[in-house]
């Protein structure tokens, strides 16, 4: 068996894992451990096409999950074929512009960047430490892949906020972006789709899932993106508000008497599609009930969501200026599967000569890629499934094999 990469994506209460062959992209194992610290902590997986699941025990967390993977899921042959471990890291700050092998200095850098990703980075560090314990022979073969790295090619005019400059110089307050691993992968997919070298492609990439972001790529490099200092800025998301007037925070605090903790919870966990529908963060509810007169919240939510998305796409078309836009790409759970969202958003952009093909748009769902605009559309829009795990596996292999 060829050299394989174990991929870990640790959240505060979950662990997503996979084993890939970086040379072929073949997935040997995939799974999710979730409900950490709760009585119902559990793990589910698919190994060589066969599914399995198990209870981890009340209160189980990352340690128990990784030990279970190593002891109960992996065959000896598969375990011996793991040659390196790749970790997804949400925030690397300004310091990390590419993937690196884990060292004490790198761990310190991830800790320092945790102020901008307080829910994610500490969980990633737990994953790294537990991977060291579960696979001690691979301690020097752990690689971290940063979601912020792809966006570090932005210029000051794109990443600076109009705040006192000292806040940036002394405290790192600036735009960092997120979903960079996905944006990088899709930029390369667009290049292949339109028949251009990766370093010559110009694209607008819409990664739409429970979290969502848009990036604009010129000559294969990111020049702007919608998420900011944290993943709260930008698009309407599942539970996150995206762009708002910052003075709303003062209003909630001073006039409504909300605490800063309550305000943070509202903006991060109670807004977005959940806030607009006051029912659910699931985009499918808004789609399924869009024309249901008894559920006006569905149309309201989907219209706001799509309008915000269209504004970003239009703005980034302007940012490209004279550079020809090769394609607008949709990816992520919503981007790949919601023909309705794509249609609503692109219909706002008819001024640019974009014409959606309804039949193609409906066909490009559920894992199927494809162009969704007409042949005479001024610009192509394409649906492309993302594969962040493959990027992590390939970067890990590049540094370790």
From Swiss-Prot:
Active-site residues are 147 (proton donor/acceptor)
Where Mg(2+) binds, per the record, is at 9, 388
Q: Which cellular component terms (GO) are annotated to the entry?
A: cytosol
Q: Where in the cell is it found?
A: Cytoplasm
Tell me the Gene Ontology biological-process terms attached to this UniProt entry: acetate metabolic process; acetyl-CoA biosynthetic process
Q: Name one GO molecular function term.
A: magnesium ion binding
Under Enzyme Commission nomenclature, its number is: 2.7.2.1
**UniProt pathway annotation:** Metabolic intermediate biosynthesis; acetyl-CoA biosynthesis; acetyl-CoA from acetate: step 1/2
Q: Which residues bind substrate?
A: 88
Q: Could you give the subunit structure recorded for this chain?
A: Homodimer.
Q: Which NCBIfam families match?
A: ackA
Q: Tell me what this protein is called.
A: Acetate kinase
